[in-house]
Amino acid sequence: RVHIRASRATGKPLIIHTRAAAEDTLRIMREEGAGTDAGGVGGVMHCFTESLEVAQAAIEMGFYISFSGIVTFKSAKELQAVALALPLERMLIETDSPYLAPMPHRGKTNEPSFVCHVAQYLASLKGIPVEQVARQTTDNFFSLFKLQQLWAERADA
């Protein structure tokens, strides 16, 4: 709750990692007004592994859903279905280094450069070019942190 209140006070987005506590997490987010729908600043559901319903509830509150290397695992069929169903405009990609290395590096120490495997997997899953995933998730990052002007200046350079 303090984390949410600090986010509201500073105008900085929340980074939320919930594991086996989705109902409690969403309830607290609602009670504390974490979402943009309640005057909060929104944020990101980091290293997301929950259901489509949880993802949709978070998106309705103005959150992005971030996928790590877990989405590339053969055993992650439910998570892959979530990723397929979500709009790319509300997705982020991450590595969660040094853990959860994506295929083909599973079981090894993860590193930031492996984020390309997450992007490639999501592109293949959605049937779109990897460049589209890279471009949209980069735009989403700059939007989340309210850095669109910086992104525009970089693009113009």
Role assignments for model-derived ranges:
Residues 1-61, 73-77, 81-82, 86, ...:
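Divalent metal-binding pocket/active-site signature
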Residues 38, 91-92, 131, 150:
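Secondary-structure boundary/capping residues
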Residues 65-68:
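Helix-adjacent hinge/juxtasegments
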Residues 89-97:
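Non-cysteine beta-strand/loop elements that form the S-adenosyl-L-methionine
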Residues 103-105, 119-120:
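Crotonase-superfamily enoyl-CoA hydratase/isomerase domain that binds
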Residues 113-157:
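Mid-to-C-terminal alpha-helical segments outside catalytic/metal-binding sites
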